Every structure is written in C-alpha cells, then in structure tokens.
Amino acid sequence: MTDYLNELNESQRAAVLYNDGPSLVIAGAGSGKTRVLTYKIAYLLDNGYEPWSILALTFTNKAAREMKERIARRVGAERARYLWMGTFHSIFSRILRTEAAAIGFSANFTIYDAADSKSLIKAIIKEMQLDDKVYKPGVVQSRISNAKNHLMLPDAYAASRELYENDQAAKIPAVRDIYRRYWERCRQSDAMDFDDLLVYTYILFQTHPELCDKYASRFRYVLVDEYQDTNYAQHCIVLQLTEKYRHVCVVGDDAQSIYSFRGANIDNILKFTSLYKDARLFKLEQNYRSTQTIVKAANSLIEKNREQIRKEVFSENDKGEPITVFNAYSDVEEGEIVANKIAQLRTKKGYSYDEFAVLYRTNAQSRIFEEALRKRGVPYRIYGGLSFYQRKEIKDVIAYFRLAVNPNDEEAFKRVINYPARGIGNTTLNKIIDAANVHRVSLWKVLNEPLTYGVSLTKGTHTKLQAFRDLIAGFVEAVSHTGAYELGKDIVRQSGIINDIYQDRSPENLSRQENIEELINGMHDFCADREEEGNTHILLTDYLSEVSLLTDQDSEGADDAPKVTLMTIHSAKGLEFKNVFVVGLEENLFPSPMAGDSYKQLEEERRLFYVAIAEEHCFLSFAKTRFKYGKVEFSNPSRFLKDIDARYLNLPQEDIVSRKVEEGAKRFRREMDSDTPRYVSGNSPSMFDGGEIPEEPRRFVKPAAPRVLRRIPAAETSVGTSASSPAVNGVCAGKQIEHERFGIGEIIKVEGSGDNCKATVRFRNAGEKQLLLKFARFKIIE
C-alpha cells in the first residue's frame, strides 16, 4: 500500500481507493476534504492513469494551485505538470480555443471581464435610447448572467412568459432585446464573457457529439471540488463529460451550500446519486478543526433543515467550553463587547490579532465594529472589500457633506456635479475646470458666474447648472443652523441619492441601501454622544471633522502587520480562524429579511450560520436594540439561536432567546416613559421623510417595538455626590443604571447644577462616560 494512504482515516481512505464508478464524497467542515482530493489524484496516478487523462475542476485558481503543489510533492513535479487541473472557466477556455472553429469563433477570441461586459451593455442601452437610470447596466448584466447560467439563450429568454412578466414587473421589459443585441455583438467582436465560457462549452459538446466523445475519452477520470457550489450549466457539462465512462468523483458538503444568489444549485449535490444510480456515497464525518462542543452545537443547528444528506459529524478534539452568547444592550455596545473581548483574549492567551475574525451578515454592519476596534486601538482589515467609509456610495454622500461645508472643495464638486445623473456631462465640467484654472478661482465661483468667466452654455445646460447651484447653496446656508443629523438626512434626500438607490430594488443593490442608512445611523450616534456630553448643537462641520480622521486612518496600515479580519460570512467560507465572533444574530438581520417565509431560503440562511460557527473557537452576539430607519428599534434574537441545543451554549442570564417579541415589547413599554428621544423620528420604516422618498424602502422589514429610555430630569441645585451623598432625582454615586446605548454601568459621581448637571458613569463595556443629565437617556436599576 502506498505510504501516504496511512495518513488517512478509514472514511478518507475508502473514498480515495474507490474508482470503480461514480462517487459522491460528502465532506463536513474540517474533515480533510482537500487531502482526500489530493491523495485520490495521487493514487490514480500511481495506479495507471496518465496525468493528462485526469480532469480536476475547482472554483478558485488558488485551490487548483495548492492542490497541484501537494500532488507534486507526492508524485513529482514532472507528472503533476500535465494534469488538467484548474477552474471551470480556465479549463473550458482552453478547450474552446482548441475547438473554436466548430462554433464560429477564432482561436484568439477575446474574453470579456465583468467591466468589459458591463461597458458593452451600457453602450447597447444608450443605442436603444433606453433610460440607463431605469435599465441599470449592472441589473441587466445580472439578468443576462443568470439566464446563461441556466443555459437559456436569447431566443429562449424572449419566449419565456415568466421572465417577461418578471422584467415587466421590474419596469425593464426590454431586457430580452438587450440580451439579443449583446449576444450578437459579442459574436461580431469574436468575444466571450465568463458565462459564455460555460455556455459555449455546453453548445460545443451538444452540437458536436464527436468532440464531446473526444474529451470524454481523454478525461478518463473527472473530479470536481465544492460540488454544492456548481450552477446548472457546470452540472450539465460534467454530465456530458462523464455520461459515457462514468468515472467521476464529486466532493462537497450540502450543509455548506450558501451561494444560490450566484446561481449555485444545491440540487446538483442532493440529487447526484439519483442521476448516477450506481454512485457510491462516502461521508467524511470527523472534524479535525473544532472542539466537540462546537461540532455538537453545529449538528444540532443543521439537523433542523429538511433538505440535506444526513451525517453525524464528530470530533475527537478537546471537549471545549460552551459557546458564549453575548447579549448586548445596543448595537453600539455589541461592538464594544467584541472589541473588548478580542483585546482581553489577546492579553490573556497570547493570540495574534490575525487569529480573530468578526463575521456579519451584511457589509453595512462593519461600521459599528470598525469604530469600536478603532477606539480600542485594535488594528483590523476588511476582507474582500473596502472599509465602510471607503465604499463608493459612502464617499458620494460624504462628498455632498464636504461641499455643503466648503463649496470651494474641488474634488467633492467634481464627484457630485453629475451624481445622481442630472445631464451635466464631462464637456460642461471641463469648461468649468478650464475657466477656473485660467482665472485662478474655484469651480464653485465659476458655477455662480459662468458668463463672467467666459463659459458659454446652452440654455438647457445653464438651467441644469443653476438647479445644481441652488441645491448646493441651500445646503451651504443650512450648515450654520441645522443639526448634523437632520441636515445629513436632508442632503441624502434632496440630492436625489435616495431616489437613485431605491429605484433599483434588486438584491445586488441592497448593500448600497444598507450602507447609506448605516451612515445616517452613525450620524445619529455621533450627535447623541456629543449631546450627552453637553454639546447641544452639533453641526455638519463637527461630524465631518470626525469622519475625516476615520477615512484618513482607513488609508493607513497597508502593511503586513497582524490585524483582526472583518468580513461577511459569505466571504469567510473556506478560511480558518482560531477565534470567530458571529455578530448581529437578530431577526430581520440574520436570517436575512429577504428570506421571508421561503423554507428554501431560510434553510440556506441556516446553512450560512452553520458555516460561520464551524471554527476552532466561536462567540455569538446580538443586540436588544438597534438604531434603524430613524428610530431605536427593539430587536428579537435570531431564531437560529433557539435551533442550537442549549446544552452547548453559555447563554446570558436573562433568557432573551426564548422571550417572544410581544412579551419583550410589553416589558419595555412598562419600564420606560414614552418620550421620543431628540434624534428619533416618527414611525416610518425609512429614516428619510418627504414625498419623493419611497414610502417603504424595504417592504420586508417589520418595525419592532421601540426601545425608549426616559430622560432623567436635571438637578435643581449644585451637587457633587459621593457614595454616601444624597440622591439628586434618584441619581447618585453607586447607583446602577441601564443606558439606551451603552448598557449597564455604575455612577461614579454627580456634579454641576441645573441644565449643567453631569454624571460620570463607568459602563461595563463602553468604559467611562460623562453624561449631561438634561439629555441622558437611562433608567436606574432598582
């Protein structure tokens, strides 16, 4: 027996040795999937298979490269070099270049990347004289991509009544015509996009059986990694290549199928043994990564799914501690709890910062944790994306803020003059820039007096520029007397940004909407903090001063020093960390509200949670309240917390997991007064008021009962209390309080008088704060 087989456990060895027909290897998290694939290929090479007769398909170039390197160490670099191993797209492009003439392309056809594809679609929309604010190129591109992934060509798309009705409902009925033109233009240009590499491979094999047989005969053994992530087109091509000889091994885990939004079809793996009746099923059930407790917790979670291939994952590692669940009072406190815990674990156990990850459901959640880590001096990085204040939509809004505070800001001016689109093109902008350079004045100065500075304009262009000038002038005038939070909302609404981002209801655009809302939430937090500290009129200039420092920090630290990783759970799949914090475990956040009542989507959300917790050490957290849509909302713990067997959780003392929404809402109404906080608006699901804003930006969100804390009346006389001093309106040193955003804390001292009466409070997670009682929102814990 080959020596390396001794390194495998019994289940792994059985999967490697079997090569008499189709096989499905279900590989649980941390079960040695890559090792099995690597050793299986090495075993095939050691048992008569030539390297060029083995096809191994992966989803990333990195996975293919690492696997090839491992194989080379087993069988030698020379033999490993000739393996057909790579991503679906790289392998199929290689085949298509060889056989291009059979489908009417040259061997040198161009491959369009996503940007090229989008640019062509944008040009076609313009040629068809369609409104690109309605027919957004990104949305059209996504629809065409989805059609191709289902092997639906332009004729089939046009003939589909269901698709046409969907496009009509989205007010983009001409997508089928755009798709046809796009298809034709790609062919005219001798070009394929990434999706075409799949489509044309399928067409090649379907229309030329002799070529299909050629490659099926060449690839005597086909292996596919991460089979649960394959789409319909990939699945069909695998069938084409393996139908004759049936030597195929697919590896994956249905419990980790989380990419349906990219076209992945879980049925491909669930129904594999139905398509290949003689297939053998192997289950890799030993987890080498996580503690026994985490494995059992994950098992108890995923067993709630109906559609799955049942398996009993186990671990022989240490038993481990129960998973700690942090119950934060607010989203702000949740960030502080996580930042403090990371700092604590690093100090006590000697972990490096890069051994920590904070996982969230949506990108917009990163802001809270970025700011908490910054305050704690903990370095971090955003994995696979930009930090909150570097995202395009955020920079667009900040540019408007900058222009309101300083209309002479050239970079902000250029960024927003035609965003949202208002018909002011580059030609007009360049005229303004040239005039400003010649006369050595600001762009704003030229905008106000174009004729004075020699800028010739048509009547229509002059009208558009005047409207933009009036818009900005209104913001400039408001800066000196309107609070930052209210003005921020006004700018986002009146500039047209809200209309622009809510006009596109696609899932692809949801992240932008959430980020804009989170920016305004952050402005509310900033104003509320400053108000409680005694600053009664916080202006946009104050907010921008703070944000400028944050964005400057974002551009620093591009070194390789260890950092905490912040990322969405979707981005985290396949990565390993010693310590993971899964945050925001609340209804209408995780599971995503977009899942609705669809059991299929809810099961995918549960699989997403399963992927998140299957790490070495795991911590979970949720917040009782979040500032959403312009008001403080009571949050319900995620149903997924109840799915986990409580024996494996270290739950908060208050059994909030089992409490119903109605009971919690009643309790909070009894405890708190009904005063509306200064920075809280009405009952609309959106924080943005006004007729031009969609009434319900997200129809699927049901506002929860508001969590309102009473304001403590200011003291009538001058005080300076100690633990033994008399109480002032019930507020004195030594008292425990519960604050709307900072949670539980103890009053250290009270000083000042009347409107200037302040309390110094040491909070469990937020540290020491000085609160102006006139504005502070907390209740005394009796």
Mark where each language-model region is.
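ATP-hydrolysis module of ASCE/P-loop NTPase motor domains
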Residues: 19, 80-82, 101-196, 219, ...
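Conserved helicase NTPase motor core
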Residues: 6-17, 21-25, 36, 55-56, ...
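Short glycine-/polar-rich loops that comprise or flank the Walker A/P-loop
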Residues: 21, 49-53, 79-81, 120, ...
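C-terminal accessory regions
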Residues: 584-768, 775-782
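P-loop NTPase Walker
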Residues: 1-107, 111-112, 118, 189, ...
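Helicase P-loop NTPase motor core
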Residues: 25, 29-37, 100, 277-280, ...
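Conserved helicase C-terminal RecA-like lobe
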Residues: 168, 366-378, 391, 398-650, ...
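Conserved phosphate/pyrophosphate-binding and hydrolysis machinery centered on Walker-type P-loop NTPases
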Residues: 9, 57, 85, 110-114, ...
